[in-house]
């Protein structure tokens, strides 16, 4: 009951905040449609955050730095993902797929929110398959090298307002596999990514 009451108060506060603006800018038509459901009295525009594609054109030097740091051989098949380690991002699905493919290396770049990890995430972190590496938060040349070296960027998130890491992976010319969720409709299709309808969870 408390959580329902809090959610109602939070929504009222959001509506007040949004209506205090002159205009509202949100990154995708999907997130725009969510805001429109709040019955706001302001103009709402969908404008992507975008990424600087020149920054996501991995060089051989960046790829070599990444492979050397994490001991990735030329023969290794590598699947990566990037984001906070929690269920909404699909971390549990990523772990499950890694467990089912022991011959492939999996890496998830990102930190767990230690202040409030769910019991499910705590359990997953204690029982990780041996082929799954969690480097934590990584930036700069190393993450760019990861985007360049990986065979697949697998991002099974259940909900996004855009998905900046998806833009980064696409800019890096990665083979992208996504859970088919509404936010991607209209700008991601089979020409640039695999949209999975049968991802468990």
Across the structure, where does each feature detected by a protein language model lie?
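Carbohydrate-associated surface elements
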Residues: 30, 50
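Glycosyltransferase donor-sugar binding loop
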Residues: 51, 82, 105-120, 134
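Nucleotide-activated donor-binding/catalytic signature segment of Leloir-type glycosyltransferases, i.e.
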Residues: 118-141
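Aromatic "clamp/platform" in nucleotide-sugar-dependent glycosyltransferases that forms part
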Residues: 158
């Amino acid at each position: 009951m408390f959580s329902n009451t809090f959610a109602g108060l939070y929504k009222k506060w959001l509506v007040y905040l949004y209506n205090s603006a002159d205009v509202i800018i949100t990154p995708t038509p999907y997130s725009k449609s969510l805001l429109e459901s709040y019955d706001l009295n302001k103009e709402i525009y969908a404008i992507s955050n975008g990424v600087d594609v020149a920054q996501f054109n991995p060089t051989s030097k960046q790829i070599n730095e990444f492979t050397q740091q994490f001991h990735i051989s030329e023969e290794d098949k590598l699947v990566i993902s990037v984001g906070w380690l929690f269920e909404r991002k699909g971390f549990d699905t990523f772990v499950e797929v890694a467990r089912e493919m022991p011959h492939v290396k999996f890496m998830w770049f990102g930190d767990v929110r230690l202040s409030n990890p769910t019991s499910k995430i705590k359990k997953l972190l204690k029982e990780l398959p041996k082929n799954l590496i969690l480097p934590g938060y990584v930036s700069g040349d190393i993450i760019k090298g990861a985007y360049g070296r990986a065979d697949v960027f697998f991002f099974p998130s259940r909900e996004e307002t855009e998905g900046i890491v998806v833009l980064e992976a696409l800019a890096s010319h990665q083979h992208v596999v996504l859970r088919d969720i509404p936010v991607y409709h209209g700008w991601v299709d089979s020409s640039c990514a695999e949209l999975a309808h049968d991802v468990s969870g």
